[in-house]
């Protein structure tokens, strides 16, 4: 990445079988994230990678933070594939950038409203089933992840604050009707 300036978007620690497979492919790597790092695929804070899922990444957080990696939290896909529940609160507490994603391959909707709702719901399940010290996401936090959290990867977008770029799509409803 440093040579080409091209950024990487991929999956990281989505499910236990994927983690085991990467360990077979790169046995010298300490964990799945290290497999990316040894091949210089995480970039740096100026050219960070985006890694989707990051469900089993608690031992990878230092490496994610060091490289400025953005986490794309895809709650619907994680539910549909029974992958697990991402430790989003822990990412936020560690200062790791998080945005919401839809992962259309494993999800059924591109709706950020749906992703936002599911992010709150699965964070409650994480709190109840995995770590009762990890507070569930609030609506405001999930809204941030769906807007400015993910938008910050692209610069000053994702919010209506002064100094930010307008990055919305305006669709006229009459043009979307079937049969027209």
Give the ranges of each region predicted by the language model:
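His/Asp/Glu-enriched, well-ordered alpha-helical/loop segment
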Residues: 38-44, 89-177
């Amino acid at each position: 990445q440093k040579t080409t300036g091209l950024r990487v978007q991929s999956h990281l620690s989505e499910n236990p079988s994927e983690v085991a497979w990467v360990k077979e492919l790169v046995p010298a790597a300490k964990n799945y994230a290290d497999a990316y790092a040894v091949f210089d695929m995480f970039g740096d804070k100026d050219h960070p990678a985006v890694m989707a899922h990051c469900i089993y990444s608690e031992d990878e957080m230092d490496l994610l933070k060091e490289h400025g990696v953005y986490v794309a939290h895809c709650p619907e896909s994680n539910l549909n594939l029974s992958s697990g529940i991402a430790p989003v609160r822990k990412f936020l507490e560690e200062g790791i950038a998080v945005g919401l994603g839809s992962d259309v391959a494993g999800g059924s909707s591109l709706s950020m409203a749906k992703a936002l709702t599911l992010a709150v719901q699965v964070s409650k399940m994480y709190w109840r089933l995995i770590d009762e010290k990890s507070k569930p996401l609030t609506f405001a936090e999930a809204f941030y992840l769906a807007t400015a959290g993910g938008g910050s990867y692209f610069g000053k977008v994702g919010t209506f604050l002064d100094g930010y770029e307008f990055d919305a799509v305006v669709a006229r409803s009459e043009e979307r009707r079937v049969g027209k």
